[in-house]
Amino acid sequence: MLRENKLKNYSLSDVNTSKIPKNELFSSISHLFGIILSIIGTTILVTISTLKKKDLHVVVFLIYGFSMTLLYVMSTLYHIFPKGSKIKKIFRKFDHISIFILIAGTYTPACAILVPNKSGLIILCIVWSLAIIGIIFKIIFTNSPGWFNGSIFIIMGWIIIFKIKPIYKALSGKGFFWLVFGGIVYTIGGIVYILSKKFNPTINMKMHDVFHILIIIASASHFWLMLKYISNF
């Protein structure tokens, strides 16, 4: 209730685009585009799975789609408010929390469908447990350093390497390429995010724009993996 009351104190004047730095406006618009694509993509995946009467696919794609859409929604809201505003600090926390959810949400279809056994379930439990721990950590420590956040995201993203053989076996060479390509681009994005904190504001802003573009490319890569390959299992 307290958080709801805080949010009610803000009006549309807080979203005056003249107060938003150019890079923040770019980040908002680019990830608003991500919201639209995520909703369309989720609808396609769920519709295909429903028509094929694949209940497991429907569930895991809903989880994946929700996590992807949530990330772009939180990122858009975070970047649209002026720097220094209280509501921006609130959405900064939500923005980081949504990254943990996206990582776990992307793992869900891959592990549940490509590794449908005990080992796949174990990986899922580990990743979702780390996501929950990460969420709790972000709630308690809002201003944790960028290098720490980026490092945790990268480590979570590559836990899948422990089950790389069955996944490689399940996917074709091209399917495996999109999995790895997306992971590498996400990783590069994480590194860019970490390094951007070490430069002056002007360079930082430009690197942050690059970071946002890389996130869109990586999520598009993994969506193609879901649509073209995983949905056909």
From Swiss-Prot:
Taxonomy, top ranks, is: Bacteria, Pseudomonadati, Spirochaetota, Spirochaetia, Spirochaetales
What is the protein named?
UPF0073 membrane protein BB_0117
Provide the primary localization: membrane
Q: Which NCBIfam families match?
A: hlyIII (TIGR01065)
Q: Does the keyword Transmembrane apply?
A: yes
- Record-level Gene Ontology MF annotations: pore-forming activity
This protein's GO CC annotations: plasma membrane
Q: What membrane topology is annotated for this entry? A: Multi-pass membrane protein
Q: Which residues cross the membrane?
A: 28-48, 58-78, 96-116, 121-141, 144-164, 175-195, 210-230
Alphabetized InterPro entries for the sequence: AdipoR/HlyIII-related, Hy-lIII
What Pfam families does the annotation carry? HlyIII
Intracellular or extracellular location(s): Cell inner membrane
